[in-house]
């Protein structure tokens, strides 16, 4: 699950995972651009969610963090992705038993180069791969 952004969703994922006898890998989604229309926990509330997931949900395995930056220019992408990397690294230190590398999912077709430069380990570039020259995907 790449969009865990609230304690309520964590509780429901835990409940469903228990019901089906599974452990679910999750990424906590952080609204790094603080956009009201986008989902994700605000940066200042992320630590509380990390502590809740790591401390109270044995069926959820925190693997890392994800964000979707607002559309912008190179400077704004670099700034936001740098902020996200630093925040994610500090939050990852709170994660017990960090036996695997942290997943840092950020960057899309317009911004993945900046995201990778700031440490992204996962990018979403569907449009860059599948769009025709006119921007259409069909």
Describe the residue ranges of each PLM region.
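Conserved alpha/beta-domain cores
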Residues: 1-112, 116-118, 130
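Active-site-proximal glycine-rich helix-loop-beta segment
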Residues: 119-121, 126
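Active-site loop ensemble at the mouth of alpha/beta enzyme cores that anchors a bound cofactor
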Residues: 136-138
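EAL-family c-di-GMP phosphodiesterase catalytic domain
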Residues: 122, 131-133
